């Protein structure tokens, strides 16, 4: 089977690698345009651009897929299917219907749950116990297409965004090859609109920790929002990021946000339910610190109430 691959970030890397190693033939790659990344105007290509170039696969970086020139270019490729993995551009109807088997997409959630831009993050933030990777036949909606294959799995305890991201990418890579191997015979299963939800893009407005939530809820937020946009609390008008934490299931009658220091090196904060031990923190413009390093260099008193 001849394949056009469309993808840009690290999430798409395992899929392109698996397709190249398979019996199928990736004949072209479409990815995001190279960007100026720093003050020296150095050009940074996407991870997929770098990989495709290393594999000697032709690479195309259009600003849009809506122009006649780009659509005519794609039409000239003798491809059977287009595989999409976190590409970043809207794929118009003309391209969705262009090839024999259309466009298929790798989506890291248990569709129809968590359609949209941030399914992995929202899965963790909302405390889900299991998730999935789905291969869907793309239509004009946002992740609304019929499901071709779906692989469910349980989330490891305390899993963070980067770990689940990599796990979903690897599962999706194997699954998309299987989908193409059996694309002639696999049924297309419509999604239930009644159970649909949308995983909105993360916002910095969500970053501030609310100590009146449970320790479990806050821990899920910390794990799901690291590295971006991160989570923080305020002390003496300083926004301090929390990069890693641990739930301590001790009951208390303290005001949420109250600081307790155990054994001179453990930083505990009372939440609505239980405590959260802050394991890794970061001051503005500084490197990551363990809790004992933080307590050595930053003055925070027991019984302080954090904002």
From Swiss-Prot:
Organism expressing this protein natively: Orientia tsutsugamushi (strain Boryong)
Record keywords, A-Z: Protein biosynthesis, Transferase
EC number: 2.1.2.9
The name this protein goes by in its record: Methionyl-tRNA formyltransferase
Primary enzyme class: transferase
Function in brief: Attaches a formyl group to the free amino group of methionyl-tRNA(fMet). The formyl group appears to play a dual role in the initiator identity of N-formylmethionyl-tRNA by promoting its recognition by IF2 and preventing the misappropriation of this tRNA by the elongation apparatus.
Gene3D superfamilies named among the record's database cross-references: Formyl transferase, C-terminal domain, Formyl transferase, N-terminal domain
Pfam family, one: Formyl_trans_C
InterPro entries the UniProt entry points to: Fmt (IPR005794), Formyl_trans_C (IPR005793), Formyl_trans_C_sf (IPR037022), Formyl_transf_N (IPR002376), Formyl_transf_N_sf (IPR036477), Formyl_transferase-like_C_sf (IPR011034), Met-tRNA-FMT_C (IPR044135), Met-tRNA-FMT_N (IPR041711)
